[in-house]
């Protein structure tokens, strides 16, 4: 289970589309729980994702989302290939009590945390026994009155944090514009604040091109420069074509 969180517009959905595309490329099944009301099939194709082949769940509330996720996983064939379950997003999924309470109701936040705490225990068993890679997309909130340390937090209580084997914090980096001031791409910083699969606190920088998707070549070259694998004598990608060829790098992977 991986939790992916950032502020609005951080690039989370672009990562979801990329993972769906890779899952489909491997012959797997992608399940998308969508509560953001922001599906964009054309945008998804940029990342190689075919939303028509996705098992789409559009629940009205969190209780329905959890029930339908369990049902979808149980209905999959036992010999199914890689299975991706992406929830976009947890923060945008209200509970029944939140919907009933309306704008001025109280007690809904605590009820949400308790519900998620129970649900995480169930989801953990379902995912671990079904060879499912689960991605939970979340948003950051600012804690009031924090004088020292990181003032940001994620909604949902501690349940998702404990359940996740990997927690990735996404933050924005440098924006890249064209000759006429058009936004062409941006750098995205990914910080592993929790990692049961390896050393924690590792960081990386990737580039998101708004027209072509994630720029894998640039990311590999930038990593090579930072680790002194490549000499930063030239800023152009073309200068490293021979290095990429020697690494047997394939841009589609």
Q: Which residue ranges define each predicted feature?
A:
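The Walker A/P-loop phosphate-binding site
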Residues: 1-54, 70-74
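Short, basic, glycine/proline-bearing loop/turn elements
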Residues: 2-6, 53-57, 105-111, 143
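A short alpha->loop->secondary-structure connector
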Residues: 25, 46-54, 101-109, 151-157
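Short, ordered loop/turn segments at secondary-structure junctions
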Residues: 35-37, 59-61, 89-90, 139-140, ...
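Phosphate-binding/switch loop-helix module in NTP-utilizing enzymes
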Residues: 60-132
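N-terminal cationic and glycine-rich segments that engage phosphates or anionic surfaces
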Residues: 92, 98, 142-147, 231-237
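Phosphate-binding/switch region of NTP-binding enzymes
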Residues: 109-227
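Terminal-proximal interaction/regulatory segments of ATP-powered molecular machines
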Residues: 232-253
């Amino acid at each position: 289970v991986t939790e992916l969180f950032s502020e609005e517009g951080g690039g989370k959905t672009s990562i979801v589309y990329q993972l769906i595309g890779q899952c489909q490329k491997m012959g797997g099944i992608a399940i998308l729980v969508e509560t953001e009301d922001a599906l964009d099939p054309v945008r998804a194709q940029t990342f190689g994702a075919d939303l028509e082949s996705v098992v789409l769940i559009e629940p009205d509330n969190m209780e329905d989302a959890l029930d339908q996720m369990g049902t979808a996983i149980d209905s999959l064939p036992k010999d199914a290939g890689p299975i991706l379950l992406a929830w976009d997003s947890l923060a945008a999924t209200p509970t029944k009590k939140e919907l009933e309470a309306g704008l001025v109701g109280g007690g809904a936040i605590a009820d949400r945390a308790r519900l998620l705490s129970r649900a995480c225990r169930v989801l953990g068993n379902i995912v671990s026994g079904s060879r499912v890679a689960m991605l939970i997309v979340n948003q950051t909130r600012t804690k009031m009155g924090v004088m020292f340390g990181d003032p940001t937090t994620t909604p949902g209580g501690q349940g998702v944090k404990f359940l996740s084997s990997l927690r990735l914090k996404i933050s924005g980096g440098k924006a890249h514009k064209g000759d006429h001031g058009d936004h062409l791409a941006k750098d995205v910083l990914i910080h592993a604040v929790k990692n049961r699969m390896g050393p924690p606190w590792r960081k990386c920088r990737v580039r998101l091109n708004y027209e072509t998707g994630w720029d894998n070549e640039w990311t590999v070259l930038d990593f090579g420069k930072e680790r002194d694998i490549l000499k930063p004598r030239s800023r152009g990608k073309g200068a490293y074509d021979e290095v990429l060829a020697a690494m047997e790098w394939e841009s589609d992977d």
